[in-house]
Amino acid sequence: VSSNDAHTVTVNGQQIAAEPVVADTLSIVDLAKYPPQVAATIDVPGSVVGPPYAVAVAPDESFSIVSSATKLDSADPKKIVPDDRVSVIDLAGGPKVVQQVTAGAGATSVDISPNGSLVLVANRTEGTVSAFRLNNKKLEPLDKVDLGNPKAGPSGLAFVSDRVALVSRDGDNMINVLRIDGNTITVDPRPLTTGVRPYTLAVAASGNLAAVSNMGRGDDDIDTVSLIDVSSEPFRTVETISVGMSPEGLRFSPDGKFLAVGTQEGTTKKNGSPFQTPNGRLAMYAVDGKSLRKVAEAPVGHWSQGIAFSKNGETIIVQNMVERTLAVFRFDGQKLTAGTPIAIGAGPAALGTAWR
């Protein structure tokens, strides 16, 4: 499921409101066949702001949950302001929006607990995490967890188990462990440290490893990705490697043997910047125990966002926000082979699949 932002564009390194004003969309992409195909597209609020994990898909593919971190100001459509909307989309009979609730300002990464009973949303602008009970494809507000700093910038969020989740804080450079006990959610007093501006979070299907992109200060230096050992407590950062500039896209293969990392490189820099580049990059890393080893890479488009694997791990798509396309690759464990990009009517900004 691809959430597509139609209200935000980048011009000469600056994010501005798109003209003319059109609706954000959500596209259903069939990854079971090659080449992948867009099966349906409907209007659903979405945003490029925040990690590209603002989409969660039920394991049975019957519904999806999409958050929206920004929107156009109703009083001034040339201004982009924080949003708090979270939409539930029925995928089995439509697709169609069946519910819309509010989380917190800057609602971004969203995840469903493994047992399907709890949904968490990181509220990037206000420094909180919203919790919802999930019953019959309906969200019921449960709690809002204050992280203690309104500028914490909670960004990436992922469940490790039904009782534990991780949330990255790119505003103050740490990762919190959230403890879940029934209806009570608390912040573990010991944060994790990975790097400067920890952002996108992913957890392997095995539940033993998590990965986080460290976006850095945005000063055109090489940035990093870290691995966190979550196989036993206390959790601990065990690997950090240099990957390139602005590693926003991040996802484990379904079998956990590879980590895909999308770096934007200099594709969002101002014209004339010595760091401007014509392409971003997709890199594939083999997961060797608790370390990473690069095995393949290929160019992608400008301002790349989410990454998704087909269930068998052989097809990979990458969102190109500026080109409004999905880059398509085949991966055999050793090399990436590019296919024909898929056109998307709005800027593809976040991706979710029914599998990790």
Predicted regions and their residues:
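Predominantly soluble domains enriched in secretory-pathway, periplasmic, or organellar proteins
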Residues: 1-356
